[in-house]
Swiss-Prot record:
One function term, GO molecular function aspect: UDP-N-acetylglucosamine 1-carboxyvinyltransferase activity
PANTHER family: UDP-N-ACETYLGLUCOSAMINE 1-CARBOXYVINYLTRANSFERASE
Name of this protein: UDP-N-acetylglucosamine 1-carboxyvinyltransferase
Organism in which the protein naturally occurs: Syntrophobacter fumaroxidans (strain DSM 10017 / MPOB)
UniProt lineage: Bacteria, Pseudomonadati, Thermodesulfobacteriota, Syntrophobacteria, Syntrophobacterales
Binding site for UDP-N-acetyl-alpha-D-glucosamine: R91, D303, I325
Gene3D superfamilies: Enolpyruvate transferase domain
């Protein structure tokens, strides 16, 4: 199993180009099922999850080529099924449900691995599709959905759900009549999907707000689209500059998507300047301890919680971090404590007391963002840190070790434990 070996203590200096957003690319790829023909996407990151979605679409009959452009031809869809062997590795696979049902009238999609419907937002997808006229049954771990043609409805989400908003918005594009979605997610990735659907001929208004209105059309046509920059990757590298006392310029990013993150990182003592597609960050003073609470966009994102916690481990006081989106999203805490962090957990709260330094140690990544938090802590720690199970990183960070090495990090990938 591959691992990262990091010798910390080097301030990062230089330029990092931010990749396209995985969380924008995946729903765009699912949207290709809505229209027969060739869809073309640029700025698509080369990540494990992108490869998995290509395999899933390929299983259905679509063909894909990922060079400088990701081309998907959905003209030969024949298998209206998302099998467990593919869905189990990526929860975003459920995004094919709405498009398949809307265009073909049938979908058989495996429940994501370990998913208890009552406790996970997938129930919001299913109840919304039922309100649009779908007949849905659960059979042997699969969602089986049928509808001659979906019909418009007014749907109020009990909780803000990004993938639920995306799934029902896609389904509504081909439904009969008007669909009104209320309490919708406002994330930039939702807006990007709506932008592409409009290029395909969809009639959508209100994306970026808490109410989206979709007037169904008879047919959509393929188009081209550039994937928006990854705001979480950008936030991660800003935090990396902060925790190492470095100076970085980030290019190919969208500062407007990072306002809540930048506000908190400035409060933590970082000097951050923004321009068109650019963020300049410098850290040359003490890290100030700052409290955060995660909440849906435009508030502080849960996907930056772990990385911010790493920064706070070296703060000059006490930071209270409250996770309000997901349960059990403090799995990185035990590993950070192995590096010398002083953190106490109390339910959804983490109390982080800043320490003078972290010390390298063997640690294990538990999920995507936890992996990034361990990399940041290792970059600042004295001595050598070895991080195992780094396949999590490959789900969401394109060439992270290469990008960090280019700005001065002493980092190397050790293949197969050799």
């Amino acid at each position: 199993m591959d691992k990262l070996v990091i010798e910390g203590g080097v301030p990062l200096r230089g330029e990092v180009s931010i990749s396209g957003a995985k969380n924008a690319a995946l729903p765009l790829m699912a949207a290709s099922l809505l229209a027969c023909g060739k869809h073309s996407f640029t700025n698509v990151p080369r990540l494990r999850d992108i490869h998995t979605m290509c395999n899933l679409l390929g299983h259905m009959g679509a063909s894909s080529e990922h060079g400088a452009t990701l081309n998907i031809d959905s003209g030969n869809i024949r298998a209206l099924e998302a099998p467990y062997r593919l869905v189990k590795t990526m929860r975003a696979s459920v995004l094919v449900l709405g498009p398949m049902l809307a265009r073909h009238g049938f979908a058989r999609v495996s429940l994501p691995g370990g998913c208890a419907i009552g406790a996970r937002p997938i129930n919001l997808h299913l109840s919304g599709l039922q309100e649009m006229g779908a007949d849905i049954e659960l059979e042997h771990g699969y969602v089986v959905a049928r509808a001659d043609r979906l019909r418009g409805a007014t749907i109020i989400f009990d909780l803000v759900t990004v993938t639920g908003t995306e799934n029902l918005m896609m389904a509504a594009t081909l439904a009969r009549g008007r669909t009104i979605l209320k309490n919708t997610a406002r994330e930039p990735e939702v807006v990007a999907l709506a932008d592409y659907l409009r290029k395909m001929g969809a009639r959508i208004e209100g994306d970026g707000s808490s109410e989206i209105v979709v007037d169904g059309v008879e047919e959509l046509t393929p188009s081209t689209f550039r994937v928006i920059p990854d705001r979480i990757e950008a936030g991660t590298y800003i935090a990396a500059a902060g925790i190492t006392g470095g100076c970085l310029r980030l290019t190919n990013c969208e500062p407007a998507h990072l306002e809540a993150v930048i506000q908190k990182l400035r409060a933590a003592g970082l000097t951050i300047e923004t321009g068109e597609g650019i963020v300049d960050v410098q850290s040359n003073g003490p890290i100030r301890s700052v409290d955060i609470k995660t909440w849906p966009y435009p508030a502080f994102p849960t996907d930056m919680q772990a990385q911010f916690m790493s920064l706070m481990t070296l703060g000059n006081g006490v930071s209270l971090i409250t996770e309000q989106i997901f349960e059990n999203r403090f799995m990185h805490v035990l590993e950070l404590k192995r590096l010398g962090a002083d953190i106490e957990l109390d339910g959804r709260n983490a109390r982080v007391c800043g320490v003078s330094h972290l010390s390298g140690a063997p640690v294990m990544a538990t999920d995507l963002r936890a992996s990034a938090s361990l990399v940041l802590a290792a970059l600042a720690a004295t001595g050598v840190t070895e991080i195992t199970r780094i396949y999590h990183l490959e789900r969401g960070y394109e060439d992270m070790d290469g990008k960090l090495s280019a700005v001065g990090a002493r980092i190397r990938r050790q293949v197969n434990g050799s």
